[in-house]
Amino acid sequence: MRGLLASVALIFTATVAAAESPLFDAVATGNTAVVEQVLATGADVDSRARDQATPLINAALGAQLAIAELLIGKEADVMARNSGGFTPLHAAAFSGSVPISKLLLHHGATLDDAANKAGVTPLMVAGEENHVALATFLLAEGADVGHAEVHGYTPITRAIWKGNSDIVRLFKRHGAPCPPASRIGEKEYAKCMEIHD
């Protein structure tokens, strides 16, 4: 199961490597002017890579706020999903970008249906990557600290396994209990119980 924790990083690494169009290449430069030039040629703002990622997913993954704003201004789909079901909000969570997460939510992305095919939410990603500021923001926006993915693991479980004590503390403050030792292991349970405000 812990092998799945690395899956987010692998999926997003594949997304960046799977670029197949000039717009993906333009986003990869990080240069807004280059992205504008490519869009001016008629490039599809929601074009897809082999893994079904969109330019907006890649911009969010790279924490490229100006490019994300440009793509959204051209009506990029803020809830587009790659082949694993990851959205731009997942990508922003992976990069730890509070500004891009705010932008996405302001333009229609939702936390209610943001889970990917395995039930992984942006909050889980932020917790795994130890992005405390982003996890705090997502919780304030209504992210569910008790949401379980398909194997029954919650955000706190995944944060415990990653050793992210600040995230575990944050999740406990928001009502997440330590999972039972039978679920996460004696050592992990003891660590969780030791974490206090």
Task: Outline where the language-model segments fall.
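Ankyrin repeat A-helix N-terminal signature
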Residues: 25-30, 58-64, 91-97, 125-131, ...
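N-terminal segments that cap or nucleate solenoid repeat domains
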Residues: 19-54, 58
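Ankyrin repeat boundary/linker residues
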Residues: 49, 82, 115-116, 149, ...
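Ankyrin repeat structural motif
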Residues: 31-39, 64-72, 97-106, 131-139, ...
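Bacterial N-terminal signal peptides
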Residues: 6-14
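Ankyrin-repeat inter-repeat connecting loop/turn
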Residues: 45, 78, 111-112, 145, ...
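Ankyrin-repeat-protein effector appendages
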Residues: 18-22, 141, 161, 165-197
